[in-house]
Amino acid sequence: MGYQGDKDRIPNIDILLKDGEIWKEENFESKIIYVPGHTLGHICFYFFKDKAVFTGDTLFSLGCGRLFEGTYAQMFMSLNKIKELPLDTKIFCGHEYTLSNSKFCAAHDKNNQNLKKKILEIKKKLNNNLPTIPTTIKEELECNIFLKANNLETFSKLRDLKDKF
């Protein structure tokens, strides 16, 4: 299974998925969201019934994925697609980088009271061996500096800074 654009790049893809397609399997139904940036064939699965999105390496709690194959513009547009999901959508990402991402956000968004509160919650969860995932679209819009970037230039600068952080 994979994005239709990867059919010639990845051998043996048996199910080709398209942006906006509704994919059904057993009792699950999800919308495919094409989100190039981290890779050229990256997709997210948005599960309507559960109000949950699996973002892989596109969006993390308080961060976003590195650009391995895609461009800044592609990642910026992909994040904007995810931002359009309902505010109470739960986000399940591909890696647990929340604490390190929180340090970067705090260094570049020093007056964000929502972020300060979230960092305390993150530390409390981790101290109690609890996961910091899922987060929600609402929380990420309030605290994730990459989602708060309102233009491509700002986003690109932040992504470069994070790569060196």
Regions picked out by a protein language model, each given a short descriptive name:
Residues 44-45, 64, 102:
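Active-site-flanking alpha-helical
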Residues 17, 35-38, 57, 75, ...:
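Divalent metal-coordination and catalytic microenvironments
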Residues 63-89:
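Active-site-adjacent loop/tail segments of enzyme domains
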Residues 80-90, 99-165:
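Accessory terminal helices/loops
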Residues 7, 38-39, 51, 58-59, ...:
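Active-site metal-binding loops of divalent metal-dependent hydrolases
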Residues 20-48, 52-53, 84:
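Core dinuclear metal-dependent hydrolase active-site scaffold
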Residues 1-5, 33-37, 54-56, 90-94:
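Active-site neighborhood of phospho(di)ester-bond hydrolases with catalytic His/Asp-centered motifs
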Residues 1-31, 121-125:
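Active-site HxH/HxHxD metal-binding segment of metal-dependent hydrolases
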